[in-house]
Amino acid sequence: MVHQLSLVSSIPHNKYLQTISTLQALTGLIQPESISTYTLLAKPSYAFKPKFEPGKVNQIEQYYMRCITTWNSDKQGDDEKVEKGFDISEPFINKESNIVVRKLFTEEDSVERVWTLQVSDIPVAGKNQGCCQQQIYESTLVHTHTAIEIKVGNGDPIDIDTNNDKQGDNNTDKPKQEHDGKLPEAIDEDIIKNGDEKKTTHDDNDSDIMEIDEPNPETQTLPQSLSNGVSQRTTRKDSFLIFLSDLGYEVINQYWQKGVRFFYGDIIIEIYKIFIRDESSQADSNEGIKLKLLDDSNQFQIKAYININKSTEIDSINSGVKELIKLQEFLKNLFVLEIPDRMFMDSRIKQ
């Protein structure tokens, strides 16, 4: 958990080089840190509907969750060759610029990825606020997407759960889940249906509940008997999307972030653009995902923030607010840092 102090702004694309040069002189960083993050937006699969009773106040809330990891940018040229990376300082024109990113949830993707799960509270309200103050709760996990082929002989049963001594009926109750390397935007109904079937199975059989310390990979089911002389393969998968479904969340959106990051004392300054999937693209799915700008105006978003360990550290919070105000005053002729509207930063699910 962190208590984040922040100010935001935006600049047109033609002021990017001037802004970068100014921040390089201010921070002393000739080469800023690169930002390439991929974010999944998820919401709880089941809405909480509290029972309203006279004189009783229910404080239980549900929140949207952000799942953040890194991504690699691939730019495809006219000669059909894929070049690694692209220059964020170049303007991007939707339907003309060709930005293709590699899929994450494929059988070939065996990279160990670090995912950060974030849930943020609504910012602090009140007048005369020097900056936005918000509580952010986060957890980090390491996950590797796997797809392992297992050859099955004639009539050999599949042991779905090696830690479970029960076979037979329990094996046939397991739902079949096939993803074939699809992205979250392509797995709309499959994940939801499979998640619902799995939750029902878990309710009926408490011994199949997934343990966080030792997660069991999902396995396809096969018939108990196979025809003579025929071998069949099954694929055991461990997908991050399955983990979210087991956690009780479903993916509703996604976006990519590309930019640079500066450090000025305790202040982190990020300059970035946000990309989304180009739904109008007819490119082959094997080539990857084509992106387009979320904002057609080509503006850069700017965020300056400080993370405080605890909200009870009053001295650190007051010192951080003063530092952000000083930075705001110093850069006022370049761009104006301001407090974002707290209502747009409310991640609570409306009942």
From Swiss-Prot:
Biological process terms in GO annotation: positive regulation of transcription initiation by RNA polymerase II
Subcellular location field: Nucleus
Keywords: Activator, Nucleus, Transcription, Transcription regulation
Amino acid composition bias (Polar residues), ranges on this chain: 217-231
This protein's record includes keyword Acyltransferase: no
Basic and acidic residues bias (residue ranges): 163-204
A single MF term (Gene Ontology): transcription coregulator activity
Family: Belongs to the Mediator complex subunit 18 family.
Record protein name field: Mediator of RNA polymerase II transcription subunit 18
Gene of this entry: SRB5
